Swiss-Prot record:
Protein's name according to its UniProt entry: Beta-ketoacyl-[acyl-carrier-protein] synthase III
Main location: cytoplasm
Pathway(s) of this molecule: Lipid metabolism; fatty acid biosynthesis
Subcellular location: Cytoplasm
Assembly behavior: Homodimer.
Function: Catalyzes the condensation reaction of fatty acid synthesis by the addition to an acyl acceptor of two carbons from malonyl-ACP. Catalyzes the first condensation reaction which initiates fatty acid synthesis and may therefore play a role in governing the total rate of fatty acid production. Possesses both acetoacetyl-ACP synthase and acetyl transacylase activities. Its substrate specificity determines the biosynthesis of branched-chain and/or straight-chain of fatty acids.
Reactions performed catalytically: malonyl-[ACP] + acetyl-CoA + H(+) = 3-oxobutanoyl-[ACP] + CO2 + CoA
GO terms for MF: 3-oxoacyl-[acyl-carrier-protein] synthase activity; beta-ketoacyl-acyl-carrier-protein synthase III activity
Length: 324
């Protein structure tokens, strides 16, 4: 049988840094108010780079690190809710920029679960035997979706990209997976709505910026995500002691605290970087993974079991247990 493994990781964030104190200069907030509620102190905001620019930086790093030629890449999946345009896909721009002429490329929209969903799909593509090498990238410029007068959401989000190179392997590395969607709760977190605008249509006012029911999302993360992780471990016969690190979507430090208690995994196993990046949606998990590899916490030698878990708009949530 053929399986997939993560062989390389990379991340990139825009240079411009916006601190909580910077935000306090343009809206009614303070560092203390933001940090005590979220664990976020600063975030990177793009000055002139688009989502594709961030993703291309990651793809270039993955190619360089791997030593592969661009035409060895079979597919590129970009998870994003903030593409440059609805057409062409962000992934198509990445494919062109790195000259991966043999690769097919497409975007995936699953909000903050996007990287996990895309990684699960990429694993199946390689397991099919038809493809050998693929890139999965989470990339966002959420700053263009934020209402900068709304302190409830503007303080949360940042821009960035992270990704992995998947290669075919004779050993199984994706050990367990669970993916979920509940569209009945979609109005809890929305952005980028469009309206009908033809001469033959009756349009309604569209909601362009991020709108969030914070309490509903907080409760959803604690309840549904915790339950799905516990079920995943039970069904796969993987215990909390088997897990080396938990890399969850970086939405809010309080959410991580509560999920750690719910699933009874030591809090120190939960890596975090939202203090420096904020919520980067589909990019948060791969950025966290890339940094953990840089720091030597995760070794990429196939000996560690890592829980990856994303949750967000849709509502969507999903988890993978991978051997890295």
């Amino acid at each position: 049988m053929i399986f997939s493994k993560i062989s390389q990781v990379a991340h990139y964030v825009p240079q411009q840094l916006v601190t909580n104190n910077d935000l306090a200069n343009i809206m009614d907030t303070s560092h203390e108010w933001i940090f005590s509620r979220t664990g976020i102190a600063e975030r990177h905001i793009s000055r002139d780079e688009m989502t594709s620019d961030l993703a291309i930086q990651v793809a270039d790093q993955l190619l360089t690190q791997s030593g592969l030629k661009a035409d060895a890449i079979d597919f590129i999946i970009v998870a994003t809710i903030s593409p440059d345009a609805t057409m062409p896909s962000t992934a198509a721009k990445v494919q062109a920029a790195i000259a991966a002429t043999s690769a097919f490329a497409f975007d995936m929209t699953a909000a903050c679960s996007g990287f996990v969903f895309a990684l699960a799909m990429a694993d199946k593509l390689i397991a099919s035997g038809a493809y050998q090498n693929g890139m999965v990238i989470g990339a966002e410029t959420l700053s263009k979706l934020v209402n900068w007068q709304d302190r409830a959401t503007a303080v949360l989000f940042g821009d960035g990209a992270g990704g992995v190179l998947l290669e075919a392997s004779k050993d199984k590395h994706v050990l367990a997976e669970t993916l979920h969607t509940d569209g009945a709760r979609c109005q809890s977190l929305i952005s980028g709505e469009t309206s009908l605008s033809s001469p033959y249509s009756i349009g309604k006012k569209a909601i362009a910026t991020i709108q969030m029911d914070g309490r509903a999302i907080f409760d959803f993360a604690i309840r549904d995500v915790s339950k799905s992780i516990l079920t995943l471990m039970a069904q796969s016969d993987i215990t909390k002691d088997d897990i080396d690190y938990c890399l969850l979507h970086q939405a809010n430090r309080r959410i991580l605290d509560k999920i750690a208690r719910k699933i009874d995994v030591p809090r120190e196993k939960f890596l975090e970087n939202m203090m420096r990046y904020g919520n980067t949606s589909a990019a948060s998990i791969p950025i966290l993974l890339s940094e953990a590899v840089q720091k030597g916490q995760i070794r990429l030698d196939g000996t560690q079991k890592i829980l990856l878990s994303g949750f967000g708009g849709g509502l969507t949530w999903g988890s993978l247990i991978v051997k890295i």
